[in-house]
Amino acid sequence: RYCPRNPEACYNYCLRTGRPGGYCGGRSRITCFCFR
């Protein structure tokens, strides 16, 4: 729901889940991926 328009929100969402961050990726960058 954050991507592809708001990669910063995706990043912050991942931070809140305890991950070190995240990015928009996949087809057309529509998926928010969290770093492990």
From Swiss-Prot:
This is Tddefensin. Antibacterial peptide mostly active against Gram-positive bacteria. Expressed by the venom gland. Transmembrane segments: none annotated. Belongs to the invertebrate defensin family. Its main location: secreted. Disulfide bonds join C3-C24, C10-C32, C14-C34. GO terms for biological process: defense response to bacterium. The keyword Secreted applies. One of its GO terms (cellular component) is extracellular region. It holds the Pfam family Defensin_2. It is found in: Secreted. Keywords: Antibiotic, Antimicrobial, Defensin, Disulfide bond, Secreted. The lineage of its organism: Eukaryota, Metazoa, Ecdysozoa, Arthropoda, Chelicerata. SUPFAM superfamilies: Scorpion toxin-like.
